[in-house]
Regions:
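Short alpha-helical segments that sit at the start of domains
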Residues: 1-13, 17, 74, 85-89
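Alpha-helical hairpin
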Residues: 3, 35, 105-106
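Short, cationic-aromatic polyanion-contact patches
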Residues: 3-6, 58-80
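Short acidic, hydrophobic short linear motifs in intrinsically disordered regions
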Residues: 20-29
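Short amphipathic alpha-helical interaction segments
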Residues: 34-49
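A short, conserved structural fragment
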Residues: 48-60
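Amphipathic alpha-helical dimerization/coiled-coil segments
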Residues: 76-108
Length: 108
């Protein structure tokens, strides 16, 4: 699964949030990136098409309703998918051993 850098940044916002978010909230959260509203709309639709984001409901936004979204997969699940695409399956045990060793070092 490949996400563009911008899509990854959008997903980081969702992974860090503790609640479903509407497009307007995403826009306010990433004002420093100077993305256009239409670009964010396109990225949200792309992320849903890729299966990493899902629509979960609606909230009142002014006089209309806005869709709300949440991650369909966790950040860890996404990273596992990326690694699985890049690493041959026969190297998974070595990867897991390296990760466990890293956890042991970090916890000391």
């Amino acid at each position: 699964m490949h996400l563009t850098k911008s899509e990854q940044q959008i997903m980081e916002i969702f992974w860090q949030a503790d609640h479903p978010m509407a497009q307007t909230e995403v826009i306010h959260t990433c004002e420093d990136r100077k993305w256009k509203e239409r670009s964010i709309f396109s990225m949200l639709n792309s992320l849903m098409a890729k299966g990493v984001l899902r629509e979960v409901g609606f909230v009142r936004s002014g006089k209309t309703y806005a869709r709300t979204f949440e991650p369909a997969i966790s950040h860890a699940e996404y990273l596992a998918l990326v690694v699985a695409e890049q690493l041959p399956a026969k190297q998974f045990p070595e990867l897991l051993a390296s990760l466990l060793q890293r956890v042991e070092i970090d916890s000391e």
